[in-house]
């Protein structure tokens, strides 16, 4: 689908605008003029992860053989949890679904949203979403003068508490690089790979 899109359905910039360990993001423009962000998995990332986790398991076996303290730490369980999360991260359909779920949870809240997902251009290895023209939340000096930083702080706090106590479904990686403010002052969250955390209703008051 990646090769088929180029030239036929959208124009894509060669140079990525962001890059991380498992994927990189390119800016593109659809035939109708819509600006999009295209997240693409790195080649052979699944095989690389399996190889790395196999290596870590081997190290754990050695450590546990020579040290009872290491065995008590349950290192294999920690690695298994991390492996499960990492494999979820490399299925970009899950990230797209997480983004839409969070958007639906705030459908009646005008000051928060997530980028629109273009499912017709999204697969396990490719995620196409609305490109966000905005300012990172830590770059407040670049915000328009009519946007109140105090109000943004209040809204951000409300968003966090709604996610935690009302929905039990929240973005757990809200660092400044994943939070943008658009021209109207709305908070837009991006990047939902590892970050969506589900909290069962009975335990929400304890988080």
Feature roles, as predicted:
Residues 8-9, 13-135:
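Conserved ATP-binding subdomain of kinase catalytic cores across diverse folds
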Residues 34, 125, 168-170, 177, ...:
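The start of beta-strands in P-loop NTPase/AAA+ ATPase cores
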Residues 1-7, 12, 197-207:
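Single conserved hydrophobic/aromatic residue that forms the stacking wall/gate
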Residues 137-145:
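AlphaC helix of the protein kinase catalytic domain
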């Amino acid at each position: 689908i990646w090769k088929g899109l180029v030239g036929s359905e959208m124009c894509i910039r060669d140079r990525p605008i962001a890059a991380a360990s498992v994927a990189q993001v390119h800016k593109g423009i659809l035939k109708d003029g819509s600006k999009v962000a295209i997240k693409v998995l790195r080649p052979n990332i699944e095989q690389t992860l399996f190889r790395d986790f196999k290596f870590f398991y081997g190290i754990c076996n050695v450590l546990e053989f020579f040290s009872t303290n290491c065995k008590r730490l349950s290192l294999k369980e920690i690695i298994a949890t991390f492996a499960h999360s990492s494999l979820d991260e490399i299925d970009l359909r899950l990230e797209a679904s997480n983004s839409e779920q969070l958007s639906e949870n705030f459908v009646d809240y005008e000051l928060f949203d997530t980028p629109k997902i273009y499912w017709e251009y999204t697969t396990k290895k490719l995620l196409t979403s609305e490109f966000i023209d905005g300012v990172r939340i830590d770059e407040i000096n670049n915000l328009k003068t009519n946007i109140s930083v105090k109000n943004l702080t209040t809204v951000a706090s409300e968003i966090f508490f709604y996610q935690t106590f009302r929905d039990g479904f929240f973005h757990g990686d809200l660092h400044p690089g994943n939070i943008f403010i658009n021209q109207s002052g709305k908070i837009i969250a991006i990047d939902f790979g590892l970050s969506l955390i589900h909290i069962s209703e009975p335990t929400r008051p304890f988080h």
